[in-house]
């Protein structure tokens, strides 16, 4: 028997759960945990709400509430959502609990006393209007890597971890003004010292899936810089140093430790050591947007502390909605609470698993959800079960009939049934959850065909033993389905077992124990029903209605042609170009725009050497408010494409000519 530590990525306590949360993280973790419990492994499945950081502080400011009130509100919603989806957590706690504070501060001190954390003078964005330094998410701007809108700590588009000072066109989230750069200090972790260790971990850990390994390798190629561990703000875990008044631990540092504090709380309540689980097998289930943090930062911290590194990091990919990216701000999302109010949660568990491999991006479509429910659950699995149970009662008084003198077809079908638990178990063990469910569906289809071919409704009049063998084997498959479906759709699996008159199907090995001849089953009830078109149409209409209401509220984001005319774009020619000290992305340019020469700071250093830009014609926004980037005045903006940062090339235009 193995002990297995399984964690779900901590949901951030600034909103309830939607389909994407369940699909990428909590559902696969639950499937894996349930299966391993069924094969008698000792599983500890933990999670917590992540309750510090700037988004909660920002929301609290807007609502004139305390951050802890915001966190508590959404913690309660998240617990409701997770429980409604039957996620079988052993412990679910909060990063605002006293035990978490104790563990996080002790972890910091351990690394600090080892000399792996140091104080460093840095430059940081400061809002002169708000009179405060701006931690990561108090800043929004443009990602210097891919050109998308990004927060001060992370770009959702390309997955890059960022520092606020790296953003192009930074803005204070509170007041909208352009911040300045000021000198301050923070505490840094010597992540660079563990670069070789992390390369070895990524290269030689055969358990890591390809998407995690490839992401991590790409980042490691660029080399690792030391990682800032602290922020200037009130909401967070205070640094346990007298000299660090006003500093708190960066939320990403202490959020990782939520896995440990949740397990430690469980240990205090049960008297069982959580460390035994971690030191045997430790597996993280996360979303792909936080691969960088879990494959680089977290293993680096653990290595520094002296802990065993995670055995596996399973990252679920993104889920879109009706072909479009989910957006909570636009209300283009299906909330878990809304779904379970109208549908059985097992239907969602089935659909999100069978729709696509979890390491591939996929889409949730109401029409496809209806199709899979009706064609697969109702017409195949449900139909097979209902016919089996109904005919058993009709022809054999609800008792498992005698099995003898099997035909070749009987023997073949019996062999398929007996192999099913092993095949599904191997798929789940290998994190191939969809393939396991597809195999169950495939065998259920075979069961329907076998039932049709044997025609027990005719055989009872012509060859009673043929009918008996058919119903015997069909009931054996029904029993097997109760077991192999338990990790996927636990409520329905229990319902199947109840009809068969069995206890809860909790031991995987019992899937192979045949029902005894003469065993009495209960009367059948329909387990899966079809979803009508009008029900689905109502959901689609509701989704569009929510989007329209959100768009109406955000019409202020659109600009008129008159507003656009205010933007003055001219053709400029680069006369001088040089790198900005301490920045690997920024260049300082002197650009002739016809009537004057402007100094412009541009994020082009990774794409162009300074000498390549001399005499190059470029498109320049010339009426932007001047701003300082890395302490250097910028009096305009060079237009370039997003991810490649390729310059627009108006070579045939005259310097100073305005683009209309």
UniProtKB/Swiss-Prot annotation:
Cell location: Cytoplasm
Please list the residues that bind ATP.
328
Stated EC number for the protein is 6.1.1.10
Where Zn(2+) is bound, by residue?
A: 143, 146, 155, 158
Q: Which residues cross the membrane?
A: none
For this UniProt entry, what is the primary localization, expressed as one broad class? cytoplasm
Q: Which domain of life is it from?
A: Archaea
Q: Which Pfam families match?
A: Anticodon_3 (PF19303), tRNA-synt_1g (PF09334), tRNA_bind (PF01588)
> In the record's cofactor note, how is the cofactor described as bound?
Binds 1 zinc ion per subunit.
Record-level Gene Ontology MF annotations? ATP binding; metal ion binding; methionine-tRNA ligase activity; tRNA binding
The record's listing under InterPro entries reads:
Anticodon_Met, EF_Hand_1_Ca_BS, Met-tRNA-synth_bsu_C, Met-tRNA_ligase_1, Met-tRNA_synth, Methionyl/Leucyl_tRNA_Synth, MetRS_core, MetRS_Zn
Domain (tRNA-binding): give its ranges.
563-660
Renumbered to this chain, motif 'KMSKS' region spans: 325-329
Cofactors, names only:
Zn(2+)
Any one biological process term the GO annotation gives = methionyl-tRNA aminoacylation
SUPFAM superfamilies recorded: Anticodon-binding domain of a subclass of class I aminoacyl-tRNA synthetases (SSF47323), Methionyl-tRNA synthetase (MetRS), Zn-domain (SSF57770), Nucleic acid-binding proteins (SSF50249), Nucleotidylyl transferase (SSF52374)
Motif 'HIGH' region: positions = 11-21
- Cite the record's note on assembly: Homodimer.
Task: State the NCBIfam families in the record.
Answer: metG, metG_C_term, PRK00133.1
Name the job this protein performs: Is required not only for elongation of protein synthesis but also for the initiation of all mRNA translation through initiator tRNA(fMet) aminoacylation.
Q: Which family does it belong to?
A: Belongs to the class-I aminoacyl-tRNA synthetase family. MetG type 1 subfamily.
This chain belongs to the protein called: Methionine--tRNA ligase
Native organism is: Methanobrevibacter smithii (strain ATCC 35061 / DSM 861 / OCM 144 / PS)
